[in-house]
Amino acid sequence: MICMAQKSPRAALLSGIRSTEPAPTEASSPPLRPDPKGRPMTNPLIAVAILYGYYLVTLLAVPLALRAFTPTPREFVRKTQHVAYAMSIFLLLGLFEHWYHALAAPLVLVVVGYPVLLLWERHPSYRRLLADRSRKGGEYRRQLLTVQLTYALLIAVFWGWLGPSWRPLIAVAVMAWGFGDAAAALVGMYLGRHRIVHRAVEGAKTLEGTGAMVAFAAAAVFVTMLVYAQQAWWVSLLAALLAAPVAATIEVFSRRGFDTLTVPLSTAVALVPLLLISRALGW
């Protein structure tokens, strides 16, 4: 009888063998536990309807209501949308059974939403209702494009390429950006006193804002790793201590709004070695 040799879990992990779409078996030694949020929906059309409905409510209806009926500051409205964008990653990861469906959803949204915003910018109601800070408009179009392409890239790499066991890392990276960047902007605007002066730093970024980003990004990473990725508390703490300074540093030196892309990607990449080591050591 000829016996086929099997690679050890550690060898399979370090050799970069891709995971298949079904949930990883015990022999594949995934770096993260499978997504704990139950079985995903199998009908992609229903998933898309829920996702786009969420965007319409949280990114359009709620901000419009805040602007029209409350004295909410414009920057607070913007950051409410920012956090809502970030939270949508849980819908992308939880509603779709296959990575390519989750990848297609944000790309289709860009194809549909980008020209709609472009046309709306020509109407006076756009400036009156939306908190667009750019002189000629286009901030919401650029935000839509950057956020959705960032999600598509993260899904393609950390779900499509590396396999479904890496999927929770996408949420961890996006939460670091979503809550960290929002805190940095609001704290920097209202409490910032010490401006960061450097030729590579764009805009009025402050030490107080950067400190807030470190704190909020660390908290977001810790909670997401512990609750969503189901990691041990000490692994979650190490991830928070590692990822938060990386995210804050990248945010300081990112220009023209590209922190939406650079912060989640750098956070995810920074956590990969830690997750590989923790799995190899059996944490």
Q: Can you say where each PLM-predicted feature lies in the sequence?
A:
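Polybasic, lysine-rich low-complexity intrinsically disordered segments
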Residues: 7-8
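Leucine-biased recognition of intrinsically disordered, low-complexity hydrophobic segments
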Residues: 13-14, 32
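Short, Lys/Arg-enriched N-terminal segments with co-localized hydrophobic residues
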Residues: 25-40
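Interhelical loop and helix-boundary elements at the membrane-water interface
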Residues: 42-47, 61-104, 114-221, 226-227, ...
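Alpha-helical transmembrane segments
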Residues: 54-56
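Charge-biased, low-complexity intrinsically disordered regions
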Residues: 109-112
